[in-house]
A protein has these predicted regions:
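Conserved short alpha-helical segments that host acidic/polar catalytic motifs at enzyme active sites
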Residues: 1-225, 230-289, 295, 383, ...
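Flexible loop/turn segments at secondary-structure boundaries
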Residues: 87-88, 118, 182, 190-191, ...
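Generic beta-strand/beta-sheet core signal
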Residues: 111, 176, 184-185, 196, ...
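Secondary-structure transition/capping motifs at alpha-helix termini
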Residues: 131, 152-153, 286-290, 308-315, ...
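A conserved beta-strand->alpha-helix junction
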Residues: 135, 140-143, 314-325, 422-440
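Phosphate/diphosphate-binding loops
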Residues: 162, 210-211, 218-219, 223-227, ...
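PRPP-dependent phosphoribosyltransferase catalytic core
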Residues: 164, 179-180, 216-222, 374-484
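Short, glycine/charge-rich flexible loops or terminal/linker lids adjacent to PRPP-binding catalytic cores
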Residues: 311-356, 367, 394-404
């Protein structure tokens, strides 16, 4: 929960050759299932006989789409959708996705989860050649690169294949042309992308398998790192594997926090991975206590695992207000902090007079952890021992999460004892790097643990390029507004 990193975007795409269902409604339900991955904006684009229309706006799925807006989108054989958290670009209608562009060979709609590491160079290169950008997000750069390649190739999939030689970093994409639905996973497989089907011929791509249950399709497989899967207008599926060179290096924090607990990623149930983390944590950092509680939502599974391994009873120490957005997915620190007291309420009968082990999924800035510990103290807890089911964050992420500076990471500013004192805990223990790698032992992939180790599976910029680039763009836009 708390003051944590956000990756966060969710992508969804559906093809229904026989039109046995309503692809717009299916996408709407799919986005509901992926709402936890982004709560700032959302959108849907639908393809009706080669004509793509879209609606998007700032807000939750239920706020952006009522029945009137869904009806306006009409019917079609395929659709894509997106829920967004702004890891790159400001929060406004223009930056919402899917992005819909028109070019000399037709239309293109795209939904993107991830971050490009060479966005600044690519944007400058494109602008020097006359490109005019309407957003401050790197997804528009991907659109431009694909369109450039499309003008030189015979198919959209070949254009995407060529574009992957130019774009670097993390990207899980669903792309829709007038004739095809295409799913793309970057060459390192940083972000998840899964495929599902049903007996009626519907094919679905999504960030997580939890979206499949929402629309009634079965999980088939995860896309491989570097893979392009193409569904043409006849429903024929084929895979392009030119860039499939290695196993995915998926962000391990998908298992710790991002993914919904009922999802399965790389054949590893997320719930079991989190319980495993708790079990390992109990072995690494035991402490005498009366009750183990978890911080909703991601900390609950780890707390269960800790309780199982330690033999200490598990209790429901918090009630969560479901109508408050996730605190780490609030765009400013002030909003994150103000949301905590509204979101969590202590069950005093569980903690009063007891030595409490509080299991949470991470500590980034430390401010939320301090507030939660205080809530437990105010609820009557005699001792509060904090256990974290992830290692300390010591380095920025360049691949789609919102850790952009060591200055914002408490583990870069304080040692363990100082952090413990800062958050008001009686003791503090983090899961080890080895432990976090072992939590998803059934996953058929490697992991990116760069934010914990400063060792990344791909080249990184020399500086926090994302923030520097956004400042540059926003200044240019402000100057333009003044001139107008």
């Amino acid at each position: 929960m708390q003051d944590m990193i956000h990756e966060e975007c969710g992508v969804f795409g559906i093809y229904d050759r026989n039109m046995v269902s309503d692809v717009v409604s299916d996408t709407y339900y799919g986005l509901f299932a992926l709402q936890h991955r982004g709560q700032e904006s959302c959108g849907i684009a639908v393809n009706d006989r080669g004509v793509i229309t879209a609606h998007k706006d700032v807000g939750l799925v239920r706020e952006v789409f009522d029945q009137h807006e869904l009806d306006k989108l009409g019917k079609g054989q395929m659709a894509i959708g997106h829920t967004r958290y702004s890891t790159f670009g400001t929060v406004n209608h223009t930056n919402a996705q899917p992005l819909l562009v028109r070019h000399i060979k037709g239309q293109l709609a795209i939904a993107h989860n991830g971050n490009l590491t060479n966005a600044a160079e690519l944007r400058e290169e494109l602008e020097r050649k006359g490109a005019i950008f309407h957003t401050t997000n790197d997804s528009e750069i991907i659109c431009y690169i694909i369109i450039q390649e499309r003008l030189k190739t015979s198919s959209i999939e070949k254009a995407i294949e060529n574009a992957m030689n130019r774009i670097e970093g993390a990207y899980s994409l669903v792309v829709m042309s007038p004739e095809k639905l295409i799913a793309v996973r970057d060459k390192k497989g940083f972000r998840p992308l899964v495929m599902g089907k049903d007996k009626d011929g519907r094919i679905v791509f999504a960030s997580e398998t939890c979206a499949f249950a929402a629309v009634g399709v079965d999980y088939v497989r995860d896309l491989d790192a570097g893979e392009i899967v193409v569904i043409d207008h006849d429903g024929v599926e084929h895979s392009i594997r030119t860039h499939c060179k290695e196993k995915p290096h998926m962000c391990v924090f998908e298992y710790v926090y991002f993914a919904r607990s009922d999802s399965i990623l790389q054949h590893q149930p997320v719930h079991e991975a989190r319980r495993n983390a708790g079990r390992i944590l109990a072995k690494e950092h035991p402490v005498e206590a009366d009750v183990v509680i978890g911080v909703p939502d991601s900390g609950l599974d780890a707390a269960q695992g800790y309780a199982e391994e330690s033999g200490i009873p598990y209790g429901m120490g918090f009630i969560k207000n479901r109508y408050i957005a996730r605190t780490f997915i609030q765009p400013t620190q002030g909003q994150r902090e103000n949301a905590v007291n509204m979101k969590l309420h202590v069950v005093s009968s569980v903690v009063k007079g007891k030595r409490v082990i509080m299991v949470d999924d991470s500590i980034v800035r430390g401010t939320t952890s301090a507030r939660i510990v205080k809530l437990l103290r105010d609820g009557g807890a005699k001792e509060v021992h904090v256990r974290v089911s992830a290692p300390p964050f010591i380095s920025p992420c360049y691949f789609g999460t919102d850790i952009d500076s060591k200055q914002n990471l408490i583990a870069c500013q304080m040692n363990l004892e100082e952090i413990c004192k800062s958050i008001g805990a009686d003791s503090l223990g983090y899961l080890s790097v080895d432990g976090v790698k072992k939590m998803a032992s059934d996953a058929n992939c490697d992991f990116c643990t760069g934010c914990f180790t400063e060792k990344y599976p791909a080249p990184i910029p020399k500086h926090s390029e994302k923030s520097k680039f956004e400042m540059k763009i926003e200044k240019k836009e402000s100057k333009h507004d003044e001139e107008l």
